From Swiss-Prot:
Keywords: Cell cycle, Cell division, Cell membrane, Cytoplasmic vesicle, Growth regulation, Membrane, Repeat, WD repeat. It is a peripheral membrane protein. Its main location: membrane. This is DENN domain and WD repeat-containing protein SCD1. Interacts with FLS2. Transmembrane segments: none annotated. It comes from the Eukaryota. Residues 199-330 form the cDENN domain. Residues 779-793 have a biased composition (Polar residues). Residues 508-536, 765-793 are annotated as: Disordered. WD repeats lie at residues 841-892, 897-934, 937-975, 978-1017, 1020-1057, 1060-1099, 1104-1141, 1152-1187. SUPFAM superfamilies: WD40 repeat-like. The keyword Lipid metabolism does not apply.
Length: 1187
């Protein structure tokens, strides 16, 4: 049987001090420091439960640890102990419930001595009970009894840790609806039980704080924001309120679940996560300043002043459910006011105001409030079961039926809710067999249909629970009482004690070193060193350096010779090397240690380490590199980089894991200045005189790229730095392409085996976080500082798969990587748009999408209703017309006629033309949707179609031909162009008669169809040409050879080669206003190019998307992007941006779901982007909000 208490944990000030900003050591009494895990019962290796999460210390003391001159003072409320719950969410979405008591406790004497603190100094400490069971009350009551017992003047009859151990080890989880467990903490009797499984889920909290902090309208507004999955930030000056309100609202949305990021109490230094674009519910203390954050689109709920603010309107719950919900809540909260005009004891007034409502708030009120919200869901989703066929819910049909019954158009709130992850998750659970028997929503719908009371669906308690008593251990009678002046530490092992001494000795030594070598000597005081000549001082320093290096050499060799039963991390050798590196202000220890490794490698050592040695060496190198980087000692950093690439261990699959891969958290690798210095160092090394300069530069840059990949630097950031260095060396585009290919190749090899690096975790420390003083099997070799653990945990929540969502927060933290300086600031990062509609109708993958523009239908005054339509084609052989102006009923018509996959679509004022794998081109009447003509003549699948003026159609196919058709006669007028292979892309200028086509033969062909002659064959690409764009005399082509090329149409010459993508260039666009070029590749990268001193230069890189760029559409002020990972983005160029292509600024991005997209089309006039997925679903994003 499981236990209700999994761990008892103590967090506070550890022997290694770090500020919340990551600075090592003591930095004053007014500074906040990172909390550490001090004690834990039971040890992880003795527990059946997973270890407490590493972010626990950061989360239970969210502000950090502060020093105080006194402990509890009755006249100072700020010194009072605080009791509050927190909830942590793991990567799989499961919750960990923690009860905390934070208080001021005396700092240990050895820490005071090591850091020279004032005597009787106090610091923040927190004791916690950790459980996966949501029993908030028993967790809090038990913890408070422990705390009172510790500081009681009467003391306890047993040592405090014995009481804790017995309680944690012996109190079982009660059987739901059957048991009540009784146990005692000293002389206090406590109990715990759980509701039946067929009842509402256990909510061991009171909902009263929620209804006390928010009035009815704000409560409903918060409830609605949760249902439509907005970004929600809850503020309060009390930790408890943040957790209680968050948990309460999660219970009120039953039977649905909040599947987005959930952090009821965010640690203070994580405030920057509020700007994340992913939906979240987070709580933040009111003292934390958010004025420098964009906060655009965030729903801010201020519990202290009963206020909700947001820059984006929250849709209202539809009627009549909104009025019913509001009245029911008012009736519960204010029964006397609601029923003041009713005659008591007459008619139904007694039923309307139950007697229990006149009592103080209790569990009955909690239950009734939850049922009120369940009734709201039952009404809104009335009859939803009738629209589930073959395990698929028909949203459109349900909305149409509801619109007919309410005589209202589809409500925006309901449309958004039915497309939410919460609703989709509920449907999946509902369709599983284990969910149907306990589905209270459907039980309530059935009960209401029979005219029964809503409370009748809840199980009746027919019997008293069985009492299970946990007997106290027998204690020999003794007059001894255990009293404490501070919360006691558990007993440390010899190994833990030794680790603690090493950390404190290193800290003390660093202070002494700083004391012996002050920045400047006091005036008038001559030291011994002042009497040395410069030569004597140099000789003395040289002797000191030599002495340290000799000691390090011996320590290093002894560290490698430790026996298999000896732990290097707890050895004297490791501790001494660490102290020499950490306490040496001049860097002699760090550089000397790296030199020892280098000499050992030169002597013939192969660099292979055991698992334990690998951990020790890795952490020592981290410390050495971090210290060297802080001193700008780039030569030591360079040497460490090189030796780390030589030392390795073998993993379980006999694959080498190099030390270098584990140094990624050090910030120096992000700095261009380091890599430029390293490249210059490599260029200074001896080289074969017969090698030309370009080849030498390329070889040296390959070495740089190898180290970048070995570290795990993100591909885009690594390439930006390599490209910058290469451009300064004037490398040609062919060598640039080779370099790009090499970097991508080694990156793919690394990611293929090790996975993507968590590069964006905050690098708080450059070295090993020293072992915890009482590290009861909780410290392992990968332990991070608690702040880094906290940030890593938050990032893992943003990046985890949540109901098919795959959204990497690392891309949120840095949307744009610009090789100059990014102009997309936090303020310019516009809000995530939630207005995304899901359009269903196709039975196969969507393979073609077309946007009907005003120019296409000659809409000069805005009276054409078809301007703004989207037209889609699919593998189901159907063409569908969608009207975005009809919310909930977007499907306008379905065109049937093709027998193969639809590959291309175009239209004009009156007609639609589509091309298919069935070798045919069909022309449809746009108004009547009737099939007008079927044009046959191609010998292979049709890949491109284009409507022209004068009832003409231009088509291209995989047979290599381009044909002109006259729709009126159903005849092919002429084959206007021929290529040697399949045509994949087509452009035509109707005003000049110039036609351009390209495809698999790697040649771009240009014809003048009016003269019937071919003008040019543009050769240069080495692989398929995927996309072309022609504007006036400029032709742009994008190819699978990773380049785009710019050509002159009149001269037939290549004006520029646009290289540096890491994959096929699948989309190209010309921005006519600024005469810039935009390219998108399979690497997910957008590159903006503009003319610069007679050439074309890349001026901006955008890393917002993580998969192939499928569509780029540039207008005068708007730019729409769509990618294969179902992500979209809209850019805006302000009128004052000038004529530079770099003036494009990210306007907003929509929420993204995990789906593979085949095609994208955008309507910039209405700021809409539509994507077609492999699952047959279209996602229509409407970003129409005034600027």
């Amino acid at each position: 049987m499981g236990r209700i208490f999994e761990y008892f944990v103590v967090c506070g000030l550890g022997p290694e001090m770090r500020t919340v900003d990551g600075d090592l050591g003591f930095h004053g009494m007014q500074t906040f420091y990172l909390p550490a895990l001090l004690d834990q019962f039971p040890p992880t290796d003795q527990s059946p439960y997973p270890a407490p999460p590493p972010q626990l210390p950061t989360c239970v003391l969210p502000a950090g640890v502060e020093f105080h001159s006194s402990g509890f003072v009755s006249s100072d409320p700020a010194s009072f102990p605080r009791s509050y719950p927190i909830v942590l969410t793991e990567g799989d979405g499961s919750k960990i419930f923690v009860s905390c008591i934070a208080f001021r406790d005396r700092v240990c004497e050895d820490i005071i001595e090591a850091y020279r603190l004032p005597p009787n100094t106090y610091a923040d400490k927190c004791i916690c009970l950790v459980s996966h069971a949501p029993n908030f009350r028993v967790l809090r009551n038990s913890l408070e009894e422990i705390f009172v017992l510790c500081f009681s003047s009467e003391g306890s009859c047993k040592p405090l840790w014995d009481i804790i151990a017995y309680m944690v080890s012996n109190v079982p989880l009660p059987t739901p609806g059957k048991d009540r467990v009784l146990f005692a903490v000293e002389n206090c009797l406590l109990s715990v039980e759980a509701p039946p499984e067929d009842s509402l889920p256990q909510a061991d909290i009171s909902l009263q704080p929620l209804v006390q902090c928010l009035d009815v309208d704000n409560l409903i507004k918060l409830f609605t924001s949760v249902l439509v999955e907005r970004r929600i930030l809850i503020r309060s000056n009390k930790y408890s309120l943040l957790t209680l309100v968050s948990e309460s609202i999660c219970h009120l949305i039953y039977p649905f679940r909040w599947l987005q990021v959930y952090i009821p109490l965010l640690f203070f230094s994580g405030v920057d996560y509020i700007d994340a674009p992913t939906p979240y519910m987070m709580g933040l203390h009111s003292d934390v300043d958010t004025s420098n954050l964009a906060m655009d689109g965030v729903v801010v709920v201020d519990l202290d002043i009963n206020q909700i603010t947001t820059s984006e309107e929250i849709p209202q719950i539809p009627e009549p459910e909104f009025s019913t919900l509001r009245n029911d809540i008012l009736k519960l909260l204010h029964p006397n006011v609601v029923a003041i005009d009713q005659l008591k004891g007459f008619g139904n007034s007694v039923e309307q105001c139950p007697k229990s409502l006149s009592k103080p708030w209790g569990e009955d009120h909690d239950l009734q409030l939850r049922v009120i919200f369940l009734k709201c869901f039952a009404s809104i989703l009335g009859g939803y079961r009738n629209f589930i066929e073959n395990k698929v819910f028909s949203t459109d049909a349900f909305l149409k039926r509801r619109s007919r019954s309410t005589n209202q158009p589809p409500e925006p709130m309901l449309v958004q809710f039915l497309g939410s992850f919460a609703f989709l998750d509920y449907l999946e659970r509902r369709l599983s067999s284990d969910e149907k028997s306990t589905n209270l929503l459907e039980k309530l719908q059935d009960a209401v249909g029979r005219g029964q009371d809503a409370m009748s669906i809840l199980p009746k308690s027919s019997m008293e629970p069985e009492i299970i008593t946990i007997a106290e251990p027998e204690v020999e009678e003794s007059a001894t009482r255990y009293t404490y002046d501070r919360f006691p530490a558990s007993v440390r092992s010899e190994e833990q004690e030794e680790k603690r001494k090493q950390i404190l000795a290193a800290a003390s030594g660093a202070l002494e070193s700083n004391g012996r070598h002050p920045p400047s000597s006091p005036p008038g005081k001559n030291t011994k060193e002042d009497n040395f000549s410069s030569m004597e001082r140099a000789a003395e320093r040289e002797r000191m350096v030599l002495d340290i290096q000799v000691k390090l050499q011996g320590l290093w060799l002894r560290l490698l010779k430790l026996g298999s039963d000896e732990d290097p991390l707890s050895s004297f050798e490791y501790g001494t090397i660490l102290a020499l590196i950490e306490s040496d202000a001049e860097g002699i220890g760090g550089s000397g240690f790296i030199e020892c490794i280098r000499e050992h490698l030169y002597s013939g050592w192969h660099g292979q380490l055991s698992e334990e040695q690998f951990i020790a060496v890795k952490e020592l190198l981290k410390m050495a590199v971090g210290r060297a980087a802080s001193r700008s000692d780039l030569s030591t950093v360079r040497d460490a980089l090189e030796v780390s690439a030589e030392m390795f261990k073998k993993d379980a699959n006999n694959v080498s894991d190099y030390v270098q891969r584990h140094l990624i958290s050090i910030p120096i690798w992000e700095e261009l200045r380091f890599w430029e210095g390293y490249f210059e160092y490599l260029m200074e090394q001896p080289a074969n005189e017969s090698v030309n300069y370009a080849t030498l530069v390329t070889a040296r840059l390959i070495i740089v790229a190898s180290h970048m990949a070995g570290l795990g630097l993100p591909d885009t950031e690594a390439w930006n730095m390599i490209e910058t260095i290469a451009e300064k060396q004037k490398l040609g585009y062919k060598l640039l392409i080779k370099l790009r290919g090499f970097l991508s190749h080694v990156q793919q090899l690394r990611v293929g085996y090790w996975g993507a690096s968590s590069f964006k975790q905050q690098a708080i420390s450059a070295g090993l976080p020293s072992p915890r003083p009482k590290d009861v099997s909780v410290s392992d070799e990968t332990q991070q500082p608690s702040e880094a653990s906290g940030r890593s945990w938050v990032q893992s929540m943003f990046s985890r798969d949540t109901a098919s969502r795959a959204n990497s927060f690392s891309r949120v933290r840095k949307w744009v990587s610009d090789n100059a300086s990014s102009d997309i600031t936090a303020a310019a990062q516009k809000k995530i748009q939630t207005n995304v509609r899901v359009l269903k109708g196709h039975g196969g993958a969507v393979t073609a999408l077309h946007s009907v523009t005003r120019r296409e239908v000659c809409d000069l005054v805005g009276d054409r209703e078809d301007a703004g339509f989207f037209i889609s084609g699919s593998t189901d052989c159907l063409v569908k017309i969608w009207d975005p102006s009809l919310r909930g009923s977007e499907l306008r018509a379905t065109l049937k006629g093709h027998t193969g996959t639809v590959r291309a679509i175009s239209s004009d004022r009156g007609k639609i033309v589509s091309g298919s794998d069935d070798l045919s081109v069909i022309v449809w009447d746009k108004q009547t949707t009737q099939l007008l003509e079927e044009l046959k003549g191609h010998d292979s699948q049709v890949s491109c179609v284009k409507m022209l003026s004068g009832e003409r159609v231009l088509t291209a196919a995989h047979d290599g031909t381009v044909k002109m058709w006259d729709v009126r006669t159903d005849m092919c007028v002429a084959t206007v162009g021929r290529c040697s292979s399949a045509i994949l892309s087509l452009e035509y200028d109707d005003s000049t008669g110039i036609l351009a086509a390209a495809g698999r033969d790697t040649v771009a062909n240009i014809w003048d169809i009016r003269s019937g002659k071919q003008m040019h064959k543009l050769k240069g690409h080495t692989k398929w040409i995927r996309s072309i764009r022609m504007v006036e005399d400029t032709l742009i082509t994008g190819s699978d050879d990773w380049t785009a090329r710019v050509w002159s149409v009149s001269r037939g010459s290549c004006d520029a080669v646009l290289a540096c993508h890491a994959g096929p260039v699948q989309s190209v666009e010309y921005s006519p206003f600024d005469k810039g070029i935009i390219t998108g590749s399979a690497d997910g990268l957008l590159r903006f190019w503009e003319n610069d001193e007679g050439g074309i230069k890349c001026v901006k890189n955008i890393t917002l998307h993580s998969s192939s760029i499928l569509s780029i559409n540039a207008g005068e002020n708007w730019l729409g992007i769509g990618a294969a990972d179902n992500s979209m983005s809209l850019f805006h160029r302000p009128s004052n941006a000038g004529t530079k292509v770099s003036g494009w600024q990210l306007y907003r991005v929509p929420q993204r779901t995990a789906a593979v997209v085949r095609c994208v089309a955008s309507d910039l006039e209405r700021k809409r982007i539509c994507s077609g997925g492999r699952n047959g679903v279209l996602r229509l994003w409407d970003a129409t909000i005034n600027i």
